[in-house]
Amino acid sequence: MHIHKELELTPGQSAPTVGVLALQGGVAEHLAMLESLGAQAVRVRSVADLLGDDGTPAVDALVLPGGESSTMDRLCRTFGLFEPLQRVIHAGLPTLGTCAGLIMLSTRIADPAPGQQSLGVLDVTVDRNAFGSQVDSAEVSLPWSGAAGHAGTDDDAAAAPSGVVRAAFIRAPSVTEVGDGVEVLARYRDTVVAVRQANALGTSFHPELMGETAVHEELLNMVRARG
């Protein structure tokens, strides 16, 4: 079991508010993870949940959860969230996408569903169903190159500056092409499964299902760095 670190707040500093897109997919686990780390976690179901009256973000960060990426895309457009999400993330709002959320953040989808769109935030190409079979689904320890990580003695973590993360792959996507401005944070069997570019972080896997805090800590570190 990894020991997580709650946010260290200076006197007078309030806990960050992190919105979790809650139209479809695995929302509750992300909410619980964020709350355990000291953040205020809220569900984002509408533009009013995302933006304040002045049109600026009502949250300090976002999580796009796992689920079915084409369904999430369709619902975002149905509820008028697609363009506002795209705008605030491109403007610098720290954002984490896991599994389907990674697909939504990508610029290119190798095998999109009919009519499927993505937010075009991460300069990567994703294969939606790279870990599509039950055989390919797995729970593993991965070397992790993020600032937040857990020290370990696992052989597979030897090359990881920050240690290892526990990851669950469930019919997960993979990253098949990475642009010049994208940092690779983790690989599984030589396949890229976690990336970061500017304010956006994406993972093929589900850290929240493993009780793994490092990825969400990374997101909160991005909020802290933004001021």
Name each model-derived stretch.
Residues A41-V42, T95, A200:
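Hydrophobic anchor at the start of a short beta-strand
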